[in-house]
Amino acid sequence: MINTNQPVAYPIFTFRWLTIHALAVPTVFFLGAITSMQFIQR
């Protein structure tokens, strides 16, 4: 049982990072697109 250091803290951190970015990136993109559209229409 020497392989107890790596598979404990690695997947959780990666999953959390992926979840946050998967939710944040499209949201920011969508908000920016809507804002620019409203500014152009006005």
UniProtKB/Swiss-Prot annotation:
Keyword Electron transport listed: yes
Cofactor annotation remark: With its partner (PsbE) binds heme. PSII binds additional chlorophylls, carotenoids and specific lipids.
Keyword presence, Ribonucleoprotein: no
Its membrane topology: Single-pass membrane protein
Keyword list, A-Z: Chloroplast, Electron transport, Heme, Iron, Membrane, Metal-binding, Photosynthesis, Photosystem II, Plastid, Thylakoid, Transmembrane, Transmembrane helix, Transport
Compartments reported by the entry: Plastid, Chloroplast thylakoid membrane
UniProt binding sites for heme: 21
Transmembrane segments: 17-33
Chief localisation class: plastid
One Pfam family matching this protein: Cytochrom_B559
NCBIfam families cross-referenced by the UniProt entry: cyt_b559_beta
General function of this protein: This b-type cytochrome is tightly associated with the reaction center of photosystem II (PSII). PSII is a light-driven water:plastoquinone oxidoreductase that uses light energy to abstract electrons from H(2)O, generating O(2) and a proton gradient subsequently used for ATP formation. It consists of a core antenna complex that captures photons, and an electron transfer chain that converts photonic excitation into a charge separation.
Protein family (similarity comment): Belongs to the PsbE/PsbF family.
Protein name: Cytochrome b559 subunit beta
Species whose genome carries this gene: Emiliania huxleyi
This protein's encoding gene: psbF
